[in-house]
Regions:
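N-terminal Rossmann NAD(P)H-binding glycine-rich loop of SDR-like oxidoreductase domains
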Residues: 8-28
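A conserved pocket-lining segment of Rossmann-fold NAD(P)-dependent short-chain dehydrogenase/reductase
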Residues: 170-191, 199-203, 207, 214-216
Length: 314
């Protein structure tokens, strides 16, 4: 049985899922949380919000001092991920090389509970840098011989969302016109990160059996309706304007020439229109957690008095 003072290590824990998970772990009384991440500004935000959490800079793609934190750890939640960008080697370093080193140190210290976070894109028809390296990552985890539940979430949103819906909401509040690619009727299965963190905690506390779990949002929502929901929740005044897909693609391509880490890439646009539909399992029943309705989750995301206004660096 996990004790509240047992060490929980979160590699890559200064991002969307990690910041939310820390908040919820602390709310449940856990006191020995270690976050390892290479995003310095987001580590600073975590230290400011959660001053009693040990948050250290670490490049997980290279061996280093960070590996000592796995000694005596009872739980490791593998959160590190390269999601966006145009440099393939960045995806390899953060999604593949870092995973290899973490698995090695988990084995070396015989950590009893590992919860790796994969992605629904592993089962996608898309073929991009993120999808390829997440497939490699998941294969490496399954071949490691470490029994663990592998979680495959769909597109997530919630507190601390610096990319995805969080970035879209901030962009929407800065511009008079918000462009929508094509007709905008691209089905999504958005997953509230608060629900996903409760699933992770269930894995930790209930020792969920090893296997692959597709964690999809239970509500199918078109991209344009997600944007409308964000506009309503934030009170943004931007006019939503549908523009031809090819023009939208060209503008993103042009943006990528001047920004080495653009918020939205042509590869991500192609994935948006791929029309993937992911398996929906009974994760509320299987993990013993509640599902937050999409409309309520959007409201909590942008209007929570404690975390709704905290913005991570992109």
């Amino acid at each position: 049985m996990l004790m509240l003072n047992n060490k929980i290590v979160l590699p890559g824990g200064a991002g969307l899922v990690g910041q939310n998970l820390v908040a919820r772990l602390k709310a449940r009384g856990y006191t020995n949380i270690v976050v390892l991440d290479k995003h310095r500004s987001n580590l600073d935000i975590l230290r400011r919000i959660q001053p009693d959490v040990l948050a250290e800079y670490a490049d997980l793609s290279a061996s280093g001092e960070w590996q000592r934190h796995f000694a005596d750890a009872k739980v490791v939640v593998m959160l590190q991920a390269q999601i966006g960008g145009n440099d393939y080697q960045e995806f390899v370093r953060n999604n593949v090389n870092a995973t290899r080193l973490i698995l090695e140190v988990v084995k070396a210290h015989a950590v009893p509970c590992l919860v790796p976070i994969s992605s629904s894109v592993v089962a996608s028809v898309a073929d991009d840098f993120y999808t390829r390296t997440k497939r490699d990552q998941e294969r490496m985890i399954l071949d490691s011989g470490i029994p663990c539940p592998v979680l495959r979430p769909t597109l997530m949103f919630g507190w601390f969302d610096r990319k995805h819906l969080g970035w879209l909401s901030r962009f929407m509040q800065k511009v008079p016109v918000f462009p929508i690619p094509g007709h905008g009727r691209y089905m999504r299965q958005p997953l509230y990160v608060g629900d996903f963190c409760n699933i992770i905690i269930s894995c930790i506390e209930n020792r969920i059996p090893a296997g692959i779990y597709n964690i999809s949002g239970h509500e199918k929502v078109d991209y344009i309706d997600i944007i409308r929901a964000i506009k309503k929740a934030t009170g943004a005044r931007a006019v939503l304007l549908n523009i031809p897909y090819r023009l939208f693609y060209g503008l993103l391509w042009l943006w990528g020439l001047f920004d080495k880490n653009p918020p939205f890439t042509t590869q991500q646009l192609s994935a948006l229109i791929a029309n993937d539909e992911f398996e929906v399992i009974d994760w509320p029943g299987g993990f013993g957690v509640s599902q937050t309705p999409f409309a309520k989750a959007i409201d909590e995301t942008f209007n929570d008095p404690t975390y709704g206004r905290v913005v991570l660096e992109f």
